[in-house]
């Protein structure tokens, strides 16, 4: 299935649905919202197992699960609305200079473009960070996130841009999207600098560190799989101009051990 994921540039729908039904996108979600609320080391072990099979799938599991910890920062009713559906997945992309939110009565008018939103195909909601334009001049949330807010939007309200063709992570479906003058209610926004409602367990770890440790674990899992494949090949292949297996060559010992 890994070849199919890479070719199709997404996790197959039947597989992502099965993963969602079995709770693999709710591993770090609080138990109060129907999640597993795993301890961080246990989560990383699961990531490494997935990465050993397919790096893109593991990447999406990390991205989508780590974002779910923000459920403790956003309004409680909004978190319940989003994760009340078992197959709920929120994808987010880093802020860009092409985004802005203008305050209006009861919320914001949101416009912009965002990139690298991993898991776009199986996501149900979008989280778009944008600076608040308050009359003090233009802002760039990609450089200064002070005062920026994250807007939570059903996926069917954004314009999807198929621009993702990256070797190695092609299957993450990390596509771009655009929004033009969309009204977002205030209760579907939050400030990412807000402290979570409780900081026990994994929720006491900064979000940036959660992302970093998860993605580095994905890299380690892929590396382990690559080493195993190399060792397997070395035990079967006889290189040209040699009568001995590759595993007996000094160069193999130097590189692999």
Predicted regions and their residues:
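Alpha-helical interface subdomain recognition
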Residues: 1-29, 35-45, 217-257
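Internal helix-loop-helix
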Residues: 24-81
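Well-ordered mid-protein domain cores that form the structural environment of catalytic cofactors
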Residues: 68-106
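A generic local secondary-structure boundary/capping motif
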Residues: 89, 98-100, 114-118, 137-142, ...
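Active-site glycine-rich loop that binds ribose-phosphate moieties when present
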Residues: 92-94, 130, 152-166
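A generic structural signal for beta-strand entry/edge sites
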Residues: 105-111, 125, 174
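DPxDG-like acidic metal-binding loop motif
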Residues: 113-157
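Glycine-rich beta->alpha junctions and the first turn(s) of the following alpha-helix
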Residues: 167-257
């Amino acid at each position: 299935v890994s070849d199919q994921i890479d070719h199709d540039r997404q996790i197959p729908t039947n597989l992502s649905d099965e993963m969602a039904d079995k709770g693999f996108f709710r591993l770090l979600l609080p138990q109060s919202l129907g999640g597993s609320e795993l301890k961080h080391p246990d989560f990383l072990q699961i990531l490494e197992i997935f990465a050993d099979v397919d790096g893109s799938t593991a990447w999406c599991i990390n991205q989508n699960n780590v974002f779910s910890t923000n459920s403790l920062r956003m309004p409680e009713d909004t978190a319940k609305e989003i994760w009340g559906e078992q197959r709920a997945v929120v994808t987010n992309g880093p802020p860009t200079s092409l985004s802005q939110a203008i305050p209006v009565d009861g919320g914001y008018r949101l416009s912009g473009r965002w990139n690298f939103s991993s898991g776009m195909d199986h996501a149900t909601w979008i989280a778009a960070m944008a600076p608040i334009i308050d009359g003090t001049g233009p802002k760039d949330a990609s450089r200064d996130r002070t005062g920026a807010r994250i807007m939570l939007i059903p996926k069917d309200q954004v314009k999807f841009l198929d621009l993702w063709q990256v070797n190695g992570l092609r299957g993450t479906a990390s596509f771009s999207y655009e929004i033009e003058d969309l009204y977002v209610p205030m209760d579907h926004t939050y400030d990412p600098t807000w402290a979570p409602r409780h900081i026990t367990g994994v929720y006491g770890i900064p979000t940036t560190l959660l992302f970093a440790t998860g993605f580095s674990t994905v890299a380690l899992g892929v590396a382990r799989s690559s080493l195993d494949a190399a060792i397997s090949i070395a035990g079967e292949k006889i290189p040209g101009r040699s009568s001995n297996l590759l595993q007996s060559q000094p160069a193999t010992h130097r590189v692999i051990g």
